[in-house]
Curated annotation (Swiss-Prot):
Its main location: secreted. Belongs to the polysaccharide monooxygenase AA9 family. Keywords: Carbohydrate metabolism, Cellulose degradation, Copper, Disulfide bond, Metal-binding, Monooxygenase, Oxidoreductase, Polysaccharide degradation, Secreted, Signal. This is AA9 family lytic polysaccharide monooxygenase D. InterPro entries: AA9, AA9_LPMO. The lineage of its organism: Eukaryota, Fungi, Dikarya, Ascomycota, Pezizomycotina. It comes from Malbranchea cinnamomea.
Amino acid sequence: MRIEKLLNAALLAGAVSAHTIMTSLVVDGTEYPPGHAVRIPSYNGPITDVTSNSVACNGPPNPTTPSSEIIMVRAGSTIQGKWRHTETDVIDPSHKGPVMAYLKKVDDAINDPGTGDGWFKIWEDGLHDDGTWAVDDLIAANGYQDIPIPPCLADGQYLLRAEIIALHGASQPGGAQLYMECAQIGVVGGSGTANPSTVAFPGAYKADDPGITVNIYWPPLEEYIIPGPDPFTC
């Protein structure tokens, strides 16, 4: 109940500002309760400083609530993260931008803060040829983000970092709004052959990256460079 009360407070606090939170995971057809193995913040505002430690798994000015759970996930499966602005909608449609997912292998998913090296991207979507964005697809899917888990992962505990970057105000440095939550998962059934290159949070993004500081309105974008590394493939 405490997690649900915090989530409701966070959603209500950000309702006017159209912010969003990844509240829960869906694994093998089971939608877990909000905050189950997900570090939910007490406020659903964005992180705008890409050099902040909070860019890893959220945090001040949005203190997160620890979770004592780990959700088991099969390598090679596709899970979902559920995003919510309020209980009934996802994010304001004006918040155009990319949607991504990262993993970090850790010894202790419950207590690892997520900061530092070890992160690798496993999925991304950005600007489409028809001018729509990944966020548009997320809204159309009622906030459910598909996240494919690579089949070649080593078994063990991981942090899963799901992220939206809203670019409606990104024409000036510090205007991009980063929304991210970390979930605690245990991977089983992987082949163990994965050897991905990794990046650090903070560190993977710079304020002047073309995918962070960008005017998405004028001139019309012909290409958008999604921040961070290319997604890892087996």
